[in-house]
């Protein structure tokens, strides 16, 4: 079944007589007319951005042998000769000459491949076909294509009887007349008029026709354009005309629809805020989000705020290293009078109530303090919370020197039988020294523990005085004072040596009441390592041995030089 063919032009027919006595008839027909084209211009990019004439012109040639008028025979496939068709471009409407004599206008330029050889195809019919798939026009306008047929005979019997004269040569076009004498011009055929559009007005290339597909299927190089969805094949380099995508459709391919999500993400990426929280974006006058942790500082704990909603913060407590204001030293003086301790008989029942039940201390804990309560902050939070419960005998004394001693005295120096109520039980309640649980309890009720702490302070000398009774009768007076120092609080995990030296200074009145020896010995003399065996109950710290050593040292005049050497000289008064 023959493929459908577009509108044909009027066939052009010629007849010639060969030397062999045969009469040949040539029939030339344009079976596919050009319709539109896009002007490619004459600039530097004209060759890169060029569109072919659409659809590609196809010319059919048939040759008949009319030697016998009663029997016409087609000999296209059996005739031994070479044919080619040369295409030229002509203006469809002639331009009238003006009055002013001007130079002849330059002819329209046809670019591409204007020459086509004959292809012997079986479809749509058995004939010879000339295909022009690569013809382009540089300027826009109305044009026609002129096709000139040339033949190269191979056998002597097929040449013309009469040689070509000057008259016949003048009838040929200028392009055909310039051909070599070996080629014989046979005929000229013109196509229908078509329009060349500018780049802005060009409607686009149409889909390939059935004739173009039929020709391409038989091996001819024709660009096949399918539907719009298969027009982008820029990833395939090179290729056949039937497989390569049309360049114009690649240029006319519509851009993807505008995606607002992609554009918004691109803008955020350019502003370096892709992962930034929108709330953290601020202007020049807004507060930086990095200043917000100042509000959530450790001294503003949630447990203090509900109990003291209207209590103002004491001055100087915003930072841990700023000392308290002058009003803090006078704060203990405005405390309410201490309530009298309950009777000793109620002590066993008040102790569990302090730990588990809401006793009187719990009710007093809910009341806001009368004066500006000191807020424990910074590194000395635990020590500051304990230091505010001691009745200030000397308000100018530093509170950091007495923190660890009072805390450890709760658990080591106060016997349970000699105490009245149990308001100091919360100190033993927290063996792990939980800071968050201890601070709110002590900071809300300083008067509840002030009286009980007076008892602990008053009982400290009794503890120190009872210890020498259990010691050896040979112990010296200095060992008694040393035992008193040993009963001091044991160092904790955050115990500081400077604080330990300051806490020992609180026992100065206790050491003054105890009898002292006239000969004060150094630490190395008392705790020296024994070099001889001890027998008969002798001790390194015996009084007799110490007196002999002191007497011997005074007689020998032993002293240490600045360089560390020990000098031994007799005393000057004993010589």
Swiss-Prot record:
Domain Velvet: 21-225
Motif (Nuclear localization signal): 35-40
Gene Ontology CC: cytoplasm; nucleus
Compositional bias annotation for Polar residues: 294-308, 355-365, 385-402, 516-538
Annotated knockout phenotype: Leads to light-independent conidiation, loss of sclerotial development and oxalic acid production, and reduced virulence on several host plants. Increases conidiation and melanin biosynthesis.
Single Gene Ontology BP annotation: sporulation resulting in formation of a cellular spore
Extent of Basic and acidic residues compositional bias: 274-284
Superkingdom field: Eukaryota
rRNA-binding keyword on record: no
Compositionally biased spans, kind Pro residues: 334-346
Subcellular location: Nucleus; Cytoplasm
Positions of region (PEST): 465-509
Swiss-Prot/TrEMBL domain comment: The C-terminal PEST domain is a region rich in proline, glutamic acid, serine and threonine residues that is required for the light-dependent regulation of development and secondary metabolism.
Subunit structure: Component of the heterotrimeric velvet complex composed of LAE1, VEL1 and VEL2; VEL1 acting as a bridging protein between LAE1 and VEL2.
Protein name: Developmental and secondary metabolism regulator VEL1
Organism: Botryotinia fuckeliana (strain B05.10) (Noble rot fungus)
Name of encoding gene: VEL1
């Amino acid at each position: 079944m023959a493929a459908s063919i577009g509108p044909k032009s009027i066939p052009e027919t010629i007849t010639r007589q060969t030397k062999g006595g045969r009469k040949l008839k040539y029939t030339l027909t344009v079976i596919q007319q050009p319709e539109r084209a896009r002007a490619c211009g004459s600039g530097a990019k004209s060759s890169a951005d060029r569109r072919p004439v659409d659809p590609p012109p196809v010319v059919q040639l048939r040759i008949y042998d009319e030697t016998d008028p009663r029997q016409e025979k087609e000999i296209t496939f059996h005739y031994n000769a070479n044919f080619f068709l040369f295409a030229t471009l002509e203006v469809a409407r002639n331009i009238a000459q003006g009055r002013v004599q001007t130079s002849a206008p330059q002819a329209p330029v046809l670019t591409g491949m204007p020459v086509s050889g004959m292809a012997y195809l079986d479809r749509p019919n058995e004939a010879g076909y000339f295909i022009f798939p690569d013809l382009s026009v540089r300027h826009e306008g109305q044009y026609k294509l002129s096709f000139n047929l040339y033949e190269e005979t191979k056998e002597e019997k097929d040449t013309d009887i009469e040689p070509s004269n000057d008259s016949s040569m003048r009838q040929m076009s200028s392009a055909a007349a310039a051909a070599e004498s070996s080629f014989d011009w046979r005929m000229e055929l013109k196509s229908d008029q078509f329009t060349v559009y500018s780049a802005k007005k060009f409607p686009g290339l149409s889909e390939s026709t059935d004739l173009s597909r039929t020709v391409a299927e038989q091996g001819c190089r024709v660009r096949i354009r399918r539907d719009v969805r298969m027009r982008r094949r820029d990833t395939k380099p090179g290729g056949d005309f039937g497989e390569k995508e049309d360049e114009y459709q690649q240029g006319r391919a519509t851009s993807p629809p505008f995606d607002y999500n992609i554009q918004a993400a691109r803008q955020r990426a350019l502003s370096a805020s892709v992962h930034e929280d929108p709330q953290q974006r601020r202007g020049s006058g807004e507060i930086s989000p990095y200043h917000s942790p100042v509000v959530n500082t450790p001294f503003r704990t949630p447990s203090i705020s509900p109990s003291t909603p209207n209590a103002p913060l004491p001055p100087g407590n915003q930072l841990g290293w700023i000392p308290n204001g002058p009003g803090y030293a006078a704060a203990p003086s405005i405390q309410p009078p201490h309530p009298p301790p309950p009777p000793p008989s109620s002590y066993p029942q008040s102790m569990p109530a302090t730990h588990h039940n809401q006793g009187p201390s719990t009710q007093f804990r809910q009341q806001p303090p009368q004066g500006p309560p000191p807020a424990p902050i910074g590194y000395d939070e635990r020590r500051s919370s304990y230091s505010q419960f001691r009745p200030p005998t000397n308000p100018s004394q530093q509170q950091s020197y007495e923190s660890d001693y009072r805390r450890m005295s709760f658990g080591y120096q106060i016997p349970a039988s000699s105490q009245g109520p149990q308001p100091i039980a919360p100190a033993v309640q927290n063996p792990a020294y939980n800071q968050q649980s201890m601070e709110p309890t002590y900071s809300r009720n300083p008067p509840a523990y002030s009286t009980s702490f007076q008892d602990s302070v008053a009982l400290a000398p009794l503890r120190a005085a009872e210890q020498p009774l259990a010691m050896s009768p040979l112990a010296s007076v200095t060992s008694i004072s040393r035992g008193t120092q040993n009963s001091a609080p044991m160092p904790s995990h955050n115990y500081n040596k400077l604080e330990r030296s300051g806490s020992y200074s609180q026992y100065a009145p206790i050491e003054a009441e105890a009898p002292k020896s006239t000969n004060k010995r150094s630490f190395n003399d008392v705790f020296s390592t024994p070099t001889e065996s001890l027998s008969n109950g002798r001790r390194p710290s015996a009084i007799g041995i110490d007196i002999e050593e002191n007497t011997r040292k005074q007689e020998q005049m032993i002293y240490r030089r600045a360089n560390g050497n020990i000098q031994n000289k007799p005393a000057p008064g004993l010589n």
